[in-house]
């Protein structure tokens, strides 16, 4: 018999899971998400979260509490009489009373192979650290930071070509399927939980804009990982002088390339930039106030001569 669920999520990453659960016949009693934020032109309109948009399209009641710590919030949560809650990038801490409210517990989809990369930015940090693989896990939540017992996991290799955006989209799709499988097992009474290992714990700190500047004095593979791990947001950037003007360019994609030179120096007309060892060839970038563009299109309108310095 399908489960009666509360779904709790906010960004695009959570949308595939909501759609898959609804599509597999589970009853979504309510969707909890963050409140709309000012946006649009001049920031005058209130913009709903991606999850709120999808929930309303599906006709599911939406709840946007400022906190879950009040007795009023707990009473409202309990009133849904859910079998379980599914939590995907909700963005708010769930107190123990909320975790205890659904009959079968609360289950979180986390975008890493726990206990590695607990915390806010597991996708970015996995790429930036040069991990060979990552994945998604379904865990039964406790009050700790991503410390709950693991129910299911799916692994995914990380290639040199993957950006955080690429990995985000793949893990969102894989994770949606994984959560559907987990809820099916929970429904049958056959969901097995395994404690996380004590060894190998790392934390994925929130990405700060201050760390986005590219350090060309690092090896080429580290520069590539930095660029791809921060693409598209906040976007790894570097400054260069074009037509006598200092310009900040976000570099969104690159590839390892042969070549040597002073770190930060352009070494050919294909926008290949030297690093401490080796080089990277820029394949996609973004100028301030402009949209992303292929490097080839950028070079058709802007001459970037060998010897030009990025820094």
UniProtKB/Swiss-Prot annotation:
A GO molecular-function descriptor: methionyl-tRNA formyltransferase activity
Residues at which (6S)-5,6,7,8-tetrahydrofolate binds: 112-115
E.C. number: 2.1.2.9
InterPro entries: Fmt (IPR005794), Formyl_trans_C (IPR005793), Formyl_transf_N (IPR002376), Formyl_transf_N_sf (IPR036477), Formyl_transferase-like_C_sf (IPR011034), GART_AS (IPR001555), Met-tRNA-FMT_C (IPR044135), Met-tRNA-FMT_N (IPR041711)
Enzyme class: transferase
Domain of life: Bacteria
Keywords: Protein biosynthesis, Transferase
Gene3D superfamilies according to UniProt: 3.40.50.12230
Keyword Protein biosynthesis: yes
Catalytic activity as recorded in UniProt: L-methionyl-tRNA(fMet) + (6R)-10-formyltetrahydrofolate = N-formyl-L-methionyl-tRNA(fMet) + (6S)-5,6,7,8-tetrahydrofolate + H(+)
Annotated Gene Ontology cellular component terms: cytosol
Pfam families: Formyl_trans_C, Formyl_trans_N
Protein family per UniProt: Belongs to the Fmt family.
Described purpose of this protein according to its UniProt entry: Attaches a formyl group to the free amino group of methionyl-tRNA(fMet). The formyl group appears to play a dual role in the initiator identity of N-formylmethionyl-tRNA by promoting its recognition by IF2 and preventing the misappropriation of this tRNA by the elongation apparatus.
Name of protein: Methionyl-tRNA formyltransferase
Organism of origin: Bradyrhizobium sp. (strain BTAi1 / ATCC BAA-1182)
Gene: fmt
């Amino acid at each position: 018999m399908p489960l009666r669920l509360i779904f709790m999520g906010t960004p695009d990453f959570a949308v595939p899971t909501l759609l898959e659960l609804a599509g597999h016949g589970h009853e979504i009693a309510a969707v909890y998400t963050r409140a709309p934020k000012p946006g649009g032109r001049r920031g005058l309109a209130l913009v709903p979260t991606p999850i709120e948009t999808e929930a309303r399209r599906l006709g599911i009641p939406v709840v946007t509490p400022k906190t879950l710590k009040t007795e009023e919030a707990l009473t409202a949560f309990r009133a849904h009489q859910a079998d379980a809650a599914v939590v995907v990038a909700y963005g708010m801490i769930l107190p123990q009373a909320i975790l205890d409210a659904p009959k079968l517990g609360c289950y979180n989809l986390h975008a890493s192979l726990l206990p590695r990369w607990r915390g806010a930015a597991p996708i970015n940090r996995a790429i930036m650290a040069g991990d060979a693989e990552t994945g998604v896990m379904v865990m039964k939540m406790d009050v700790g930071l991503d410390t709950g017992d693991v129910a299911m996991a799916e692994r995914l290799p990380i290639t040199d070509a993957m950006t955080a955006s690429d990995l985000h989209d793949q893990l969102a799709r894989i994770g949606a399927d994984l959560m559907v499988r987990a809820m099916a097992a929970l429904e049958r009474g056959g969901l097995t939980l395994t404690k996380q290992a004590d060894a190998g714990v790392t934390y994925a700190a929130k990405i700060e804009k201050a760390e986005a500047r590219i350090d060309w004095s690092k090896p080429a593979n580290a520069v590539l990982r930095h660029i791809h791990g921060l693409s598209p947001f906040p976007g790894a950037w570097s400054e260069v002088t074009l037509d006598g003007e200092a310009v900040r360019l976000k570099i969104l994609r690159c590839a390892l390339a042969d070549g040597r030179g002073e770190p930060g120096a352009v070494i050919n007309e294909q926008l290949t930039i030297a690093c401490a060892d080796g080089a990277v060839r820029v394949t996609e970038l973004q100028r301030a106030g402009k949209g992303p563009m292929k490097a080839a299109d950028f070079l058709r309108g802007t001459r970037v001569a060998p010897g030009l310095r990025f820094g």
